[in-house]
Amino acid sequence: MSVYSLPPAPPSDEHQLFQRAQALSGFTLGELATRAQWVIPADLKRVKGWVGMLLEFYLGASAGSKPEQDFADIGIELKTIPISAQGKPLETTFVCVAPLTGNSGVTWENSHVRHKLARVLWVPVEGERHIPLAERRVGAPLLWSPNVEEEELLRRDWEELMDLIVLGKVESITARHGQVLQLRPKAANSRALTEAIGEFGQPIMTLPRGFYLKKTLTAPMLARHFLL
């Protein structure tokens, strides 16, 4: 792999994207960062999205942090997932920011969550903390769309969580709500507040929330992929 100073053009189709992802498999993050002339952080505490951004660079992603999919032209979202030596996910997976106001007419079919998860390129990365960031290896990629059962579980959780938001109960939602999808605060600091609906229909200020996939969905998915 030669030195990259500019990212490649966006992939023309799913096959090309998957080939690019396969070509990264087995490399360490340090090797990829050096070839891209990126500085490797000591850890991910202040740069949580660094691994994803590095892989986006190599794969030719275009969306950045916009609400559309990372590869909008071919309808694919990229998700990196830190895994253990046993191939199990080590944390939940961020999907998108949750809308806390203006939700009339929103259904599962036209929701951001469903749009983002329609087709996902999963790239597992070694994530155990004793492995220095630069030495963590990229794993074999997986192209995934929710099967009928997964889609039904996601829809049910999304509808339950959105009902609570619309009914003004956002403050009472905990990470335990939802079988495969959870809602929890997403903010770099506790002063970053956003508007939501209170219990009596009044506007309130609260922490922004994000939708996250629980390990109850990603662990079986990876197990099928790696034949664990």
Curated annotation (Swiss-Prot):
**Which Gene3D superfamilies does UniProt cross-reference here?**
DNA mismatch repair MutH/Restriction endonuclease, type II (3.40.600.10)
Location in the cell: Cytoplasm
**Single GO cellular component term:** cytoplasm
Which Pfam families would you find in this protein's record? MutH (PF02976)
Q: Which SUPFAM superfamilies match?
A: Restriction endonuclease-like (SSF52980)
Which family does the record claim for this protein? Belongs to the MutH family.
What this protein is reported to do is described as: Sequence-specific endonuclease that cleaves unmethylated GATC sequences. It is involved in DNA mismatch repair.
Protein name stated in the entry? DNA mismatch repair protein MutH
Q: Where does this protein come from, organism-wise?
A: Yersinia pseudotuberculosis serotype IB (strain PB1/+)
Record lineage: Bacteria, Pseudomonadati, Pseudomonadota, Gammaproteobacteria, Enterobacterales
Write the gene name.
mutH
